[in-house]
Amino acid sequence: MLARQNMIRIFISGLILSGWMASHADTPATPIISIIIDDLGYQYKVGQRAVRLNGNITCAFLPNAPYAGRLAEQAHLQQKEVMLHLPMEAETENHLGPGALTQCMSEKAFKTLVHSNLAAIPHVRGFNNHMGSRLTKSPRLMGWLMQAAMFRDDLYFVDSRTTTESVAQLEAERRRIAATRRDIFLDYDRSAGIVADQLTELVRHAKRQGTALAIGHPYPETLATLEAWLPTLEQQGIKLVPVSELIRIRLQRRIAPWQMSSSHSPRVAKNSKQ
């Protein structure tokens, strides 16, 4: 009887352990971060400085910016992942520049502009919203956006979360476009002290959640802080990866291990801006 009870205890312990291992098998042992530098393409020297940052920084370029194509080529040569930073109508301060999506556009014009904006940036792997606090709240318009993006089967989407009411990530996932959202804004305040504090929060978030995604801008304060901070990542035990890799890890963590082989994978595995 005692032997049978011991066998039952061992069996139950095994089930508990195997369940724990299944739930933790895809959790990165090393905290993973990604950093997107937005708003690239208008200032050539500033863009070069961003492209030359140490490690797997992801570079997001505004469509039709005078140096966007040239800098995107340089980013690709530097083995940086390239994104389209897609202008979208905001609630206020709509200084969006060329290529902006607005709510007054017809469906055809809207989708045509999405296609031309994506075509304007070489080596583009994904896209995120520039401003967009008005547009990203609209399921209809975000549906148009994601339908237009489906002509490429390898694009991902990052919701910059310029409003807490955004439905952009949801609409992307409804169409099986790999998507995620920003966790940290590095430079809602441009002071170097704030950027450093936000980088500390980025690491804290990654250690707590396994992954963390930050967005910054090519401000002198942000670039200088990153230039000093990025070489310290290995010492901190943090891994910087392209956004596509972070999304792949996050998607794996959302799918139970026993679902991996049967599930249909998606098409690729304080803020002041609105």
Model segments located where?
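Active-site beta->alpha N-cap acidic-glycine motif
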Residues: 27-94
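Hydrophobic faces of well-ordered beta-strands that scaffold small-molecule active sites
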Residues: 33-37, 57-60, 80-86, 127-129, ...
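Catalytic beta/alpha-barrel core
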Residues: 40, 58-64, 128-138, 153-163, ...
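Substrate-binding cleft of extracellular glycoside hydrolase catalytic domains
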Residues: 71, 75-123
